[in-house]
Structures are given as C-alpha cells and as structure tokens.
Amino acid sequence: RRIIERLDLTIPQGESLALIGANGTGKSTLLRMIVRLAEADAGTISVLGDEVGSLRGAALKRFRARVGVVFQKHNLVSRLSALSNVVHGVQSRRSGPRTWAQALAPAEIRDEAMECLAAVGLADKAMQRADSLSGGQSQRVAIARMLMQRPQIVLADEPDASLDPRAGREVMELLFRLTRDKGLTLVFVSHHMAHARRFSDRIVGLGNGGIALDRRALHCNEAELAAFFEEPAEDVPAGQPALVFA
C-alpha cells in the first residue's frame, strides 16, 4: 500500500519545518526516503543538488554524511561513555579515500566531541556510561553525536517522544537553537502542536496521501491545528510527486 501518493514540496536552506499528521500518513516514511532508508517508487527527491534516488555506493555515503538524523530512540551504546558515543559520530564523515575526519588526530576528535557535548549542556557527563543517563540526557547525547557529523540538514523523527513534557520541550529547544545558530535546515516530525508552532518557520500537514496543510507557523492557530487532527484532511490534487531541498 502506498502511504504517500502525491507530494510536491520545496524546503529552503536554513528553514525549520514541522511535519504533522495522524499516525500512518507517512511522516516518518518521508524522512526515511530522504536518506534512502526507504525507497520511493515514483517521483524525485533532490537534496543539496543531489537526486537521492540515483545515488549509489560512495556517492550515497557522501550524501548521507551531509544529513544528520535524530530518531525517537537514541540508539546509544549503553556500555560506552557519553563522550565515546559522540566520537562515533565522526564515522559518518568517512565518506571517501581521504576525509577531514581521517585527517584529524585522536586528540582533535576528542576535543571536538567535547565541544559537541558542551553545546548540548552535557560536558560534565562526558565520562558517564550511556546507560546511567536519563532519557532527556540520552537524547542530548544523540544530538551531540549528530553534530559531530557536521551535517547541513537535520532530520528529527519525534525526538521528543517518550520524554516527559519538560525534557521533550528542552530537547526541541536545543535542536531548534543549534540548527538556527548554524544555519542548518531542520525537518522534524511532531505530535505536539505547541512544539510544531514554537520551533518551526513552517508547518506541513500530511493526509490522504499528500499535503493537506502548508502554512507559515506564525499564521497557524491552535484551533486550526487541532481541527487538522480531529477532522479528515481535505483531498489534494494529483500530480508527479517531488521533494526538493533548495
């Protein structure tokens, strides 16, 4: 069964975009298609000048090195320290015969990892084992690991899921601030309307196989967004699907 039938979307560099919609409308699937963890069977996905569907081998690896992903589950190695988990992020930068990651000395890699931990407020937890951290702290380490990758685009699939309200809000504030300060594009999936409005420039709602809502966040009100989830999304016109990161 096709989840997304019709989608035509362009995301400018540096924009923060919230993807919303009911379960099963394709939000997470869309993020997975962008990094080729799921395959689109029609249309094109263009990111930073690359047509994603045509990439193979080393070219696909180089592309993925430019896109940071934060999942619902942080996937930290529990027996390793927070610092060691962040250092693993440098592996995503090894995309060719000689990369800047390979040119760094171990001490330089460690120093950069510490800077990433400091950026998420966890420099003092660097030597703690990952399995001793709270859920919110673990997600912060995952964000630091993603920063170690030096991405140009960040995809976040419900990074606030399974966290208490305060921790979830802090994680979203952190993601928004870090990506905004670095001029990165942020696309995040959220089921929290307050987060979608507060941490995005633009809100896109999926429904009925396509885009049912596409509006600047400042122009969306709570009643409209609540109704978007409570009522069936209106149908959208057919067309050749395309997704472009400009």
Language model regions located:
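Conserved ABC transporter NBD signature motif
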Residues: G43-E51
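H-loop/switch region of ABC-family ATPase nucleotide-binding domains
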Residues: S190-H191
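Catalytic Walker B motif of ABC-type/P-loop ATPase nucleotide-binding domains
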Residues: V154-D157
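Conserved ABC ATPase "signature" region
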Residues: E51, R94-D124
